[in-house]
Amino acid sequence: MEPCAITQPAARRIWLHAQKLDTPLPFGSGPGATPEAIRHLGYVQIDTIHVIERCHHHILFTRIPEYRREHLHRAQSIEKTVFEYWTHALAYIPIEDMRYYVRAMRRYWRLRSVWFANVKDNEVRKVLTRIRSNGALTIRDIDDDVLVEKDHAWASRKPSKRALQLAFYKGLVTVSQRAGMLKTMSSWGGTSGGSGCRRLPRQHRRPTISWIGHCAPRAS
C-alpha cells in the first residue's frame, strides 16, 4: 500500500478532530459527558502533576466546558461506568473495556514483576481477607503493619501497600474511589463499593487484538 502524503495543517486537523478538540461540545454536557469522553479517547491518564489542576481533569475540561471534578467521581464510584487500571500508565478506562485488560491482569498471576518480588502470597491473602471482612479501605486504614525501610523514594513503609498494589494488578481488587491520590480499594463486587462486576470476564485474544486496532486510530 502506497503511503499517503498529507500536509502538516491537514495532519493537525485530523489529529484535533480525532481528539475532539475542534468542536465546542463533542460529548454533550453534564455528568454523562465524562464517561462518553473517556469512552471515545479509550482511556484518560491519571497524573500526579498538579500545577493548576491534575492532568486528567485538564483533559476532560478541554473537551467538556461544564466539567466538574465530581463528574469523574460519579462515573467511577457511583455509576461505575469507568474503572482504573494500567495502560502505559495508571488510567481511567471505560468499564465495558475491562475484558480487554484481563490478559494483562492474568499476566501478573504467571509472572512476578520485579516491583513485587518481595511480596509474599500470605500478605496478599491478608489484605484480601481484610477487604472481604470489613469492606473497602485505604492504606491509611491499615494501622497494624510492621513498618519497613523504603526501597525507593515513592515506596511506602507499610508492606500492605505493595500487597494491595499486587492484588490490584492481578485484578483481585479495584479502586472504588479517589481523594486526590489516596485510593480506596475494594473487591469487584457491588456490595463493597467495587465496580459491580462479580468476577473477571473471560479473556479472548482475537477480540482484544481487534479492539486495539479499532480503538487506537480513533483517538490518536
Regions found by a protein language model. Give the residues of each.
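Long, low-complexity intrinsically disordered regions
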Residues: 1-220
